[in-house]
Amino acid sequence: MKSSHTSLICILMLSLVALHQCVRMKVKEIGRSNKIYIPPCFRDSCDHVLKKDCYCCGSKPDLCWEDQHYCNTHCPPLKPLIN
């Protein structure tokens, strides 16, 4: 019985610390934390004989490159869908 009480007290203390941290967050931090980053390129399989994997633009899937960094720098960013 004593160990279960100790466990509950520990869980309660950890919950209070987490709640305290959430209250201390600024509005700017909360707005920034709910954004999802979608990279401009995705990995795909290519029809090339020597190289099976390539990286294609999400906005223009017909544009594909062998190097992911090159693809990320040359692809236009994806436009978010807003309803």
Swiss-Prot record:
Tissue note: Expressed exclusively in ovule embryo sacs and in early developing endosperms.
Signal peptide bounds: 1-22
Disulfide links within the chain: C41-C56, C46-C75, C54-C71, C57-C64
Record keywords: Developmental protein, Disulfide bond, Signal
Name of a matching Pfam family: ESF1
InterPro entries in UniProt: ESF1_brassicaceae
GO BP terms: embryonic axis specification; suspensor development
Consequence of gene disruption: No visible phenotype, due to redundancy with ESF1.2 and ESF1.3. Simultaneous down-regulation of all 3 genes by RNAi induces embryo abnormalities.
Function: Maternally-contributed central cell peptide regulating suspensor development and correct auxin distribution in early developing embryos.
Annotated family: Belongs to the MEG family.
Protein name as catalogued: EMBRYO SURROUNDING FACTOR 1.1
